[in-house]
Amino acid sequence: MTSMIPTARYRPVVRIGNWFEDICLEQEKVQAFKSLRDRGQLLVEKTRRLFDNFHKAIELEAPKENVYFGAIVQLMPMKMNICEEHVKAQPALSVIINERVVRHSQNINDECEITIAPSVTPCVRNSFRIVSGDEKDRTNEVIKYGQQFRLECVESQDDMLLLYSAPKSADLKSMIYTTFDSRKWGEINLPLGLCRKSNCGPGKEIPSAYTKWFCTHIEPKKRFESHGSPVPSNTALVITHVPTNKNLAAENVVVQTLFGPEFLVSVQNYKDIYNRERWQNIWMICNGQSEGKR
């Protein structure tokens, strides 16, 4: 029975043609690979360049008692109340880039997202410069409780990249695109993003108020009397978003990024039964000291 089944038979010239076509396709792949390599467009080279740009070492402000405008600092949650083990690398607010963006950009840009990542050493992705919130040059002035400020990426040159958040629209959607999101009681929290200063202001895409923040005392009973006093560095405090009146929050949500597992961050209020902020809303502004006042 098997001998009666017809089998495909090709003439030698047809087989040679097929082999030649396969060889041409392989040569075309090799030429495309060499062309991408010569232009530095290989994904492995882009990834290597990305890590070099994001992990470029940054020198923080010299340790001082208070926080000053113009200083390069890190924003660190006082405690990630997740496990009892002591973690050597203190987590810090950081910038990440997703797989979609890395193919056309390997630098910090307005398409990057914000997370909380382990900070072994200060670098470009986890350090920010504190600038005035009223368009005035207040460099070397002490920041006070209740005074508005902005957080600028240290790699910003001509067009500053500012940290911002935005309230939801009428359909409860956010204007900030993020790969992951966190929720409180089923509702999506407000995410953080980066925007260029040229896109902020009257008639622009993003109102300038969305980029403004201020600090308050960790104790609710002391906020009235501490308003207007200098903000101490490396000390527990609450960072509040001006237009939404919600606090910067470290979320107990782990996601996988190009840099490894990291925690999400949002703008949301977390309070206990005594109306005091929980660990998610407690931060410190680190200006170079290895350990904060705990």
Regions found by a protein language model. Name each.
Residues 1-294:
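Lectin-like carbohydrate-binding module/patch detector with strong preference for beta-trefoil
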